[in-house]
């Protein structure tokens, strides 16, 4: 049973070697590739370094090429100047100085605008109006119903308005009665003539009851026309 296993192991190793050989053959490298890589490496090496060289006096912090004795002399002078300008202060003096500094803080600094006030800025309250909270759906529905009721117009309302407009437009006889009489003296004769014509029409209607209804209707129309003309004359006066 062990012999076939050894054979399989050998066959696996042989197949892997063959695969490696095939991959190497397939991986073809162009002839000029190695030369390009070598040229790039040589160029990188040939470029000058940008690091600061400590040997050069231009970059070692001693451009003036001073001696250490001169440096110590300058350091002593600077120390003396600083000692003369600095003094020791106790705690009590520090408190007094801080209070005085707070009083004079308004004069210090600068103002961004002419209208800006000195001192610390107070709390700025926002002037933006807040939005109203959304009401519930029930309240919205009730408000909409009220608006619809106010805007709605029923047929009864329309009929009422139409009747109110028709009432003042009464018959011409009523209009003539409401108007005040003017210049009665001059028109007495005309009134008498009109009344006589109306009376004659009425008499003919009573005297001849046996005639046709058409004649009676015509006479009624004539009577109405005479009344209308009489009212128009009074209105023009």
From Swiss-Prot:
Where is this chain's protein located in or outside the cell?
Answer: Nucleus envelope
Instruction: Kindly provide the PTM information from the record.
Output: Phosphorylated by ck1/csnk1a1.
Q: Where is this motif: Nucleolar localization signal (NLS2)?
A: 217-225
Q: Where is this motif: Nucleolar localization signal (NLS1)?
A: 182-190
Summarize the record's disruption phenotype note: Morpholino knockdown results in embryos with small eyes, head and brain structures.
Q: Where is this region: Disordered?
A: 1-23, 50-69, 97-237
Instruction: Name the keywords, alphabetized.
Output: Developmental protein, Nucleus, Wnt signaling pathway
Q: Where is the composition biased (Basic and acidic residues)?
A: 52-62, 203-216, 225-237
Q: Kindly indicate whether the keyword Nucleus belongs to this entry.
A: yes
Q: Which GO terms describe its biological process?
A: negative regulation of Wnt signaling pathway; Spemann organizer formation; Wnt signaling pathway
Assigned GO CC terms: nuclear envelope
Name the residue ranges with Polar residues bias.
Answer: 162-177
Q: Where is the composition biased (Basic residues)?
A: 181-190
Top-rank taxon of the source lineage equals Eukaryota
Query: What's one Pfam family here?
Result: CUSTOS
**Predominant localisation class:** nucleus
Q: What does this protein do?
A: Essential for Spemann-Mangold organizer formation and subsequent anterior head development in the embryo. Inhibits canonical Wnt signaling pathway by antagonizing nuclear import of beta-catenin (ctnnb1) during embryogenesis.
Its assembly, as annotated, is: Interacts (via NLS1 and NLS2) with dvl2; the interaction is negatively regulated by Wnt stimulation. Interacts with csnk1a1. Interacts with ctnnb1; the interaction is positively regulated by Wnt stimulation.
Miscellaneous comment as given in the Swiss-Prot or TrEMBL entry: Named Custos for the Latin term for 'guard' or 'keeper'.
The record's listing under PANTHER family reads: CHROMOSOME 12 ORF 43 HOMOLOG, PROTEIN CUSTOS
Its family remark reads: Belongs to the CUSTOS family.
State the name under which the record lists this protein.
Protein CUSTOS
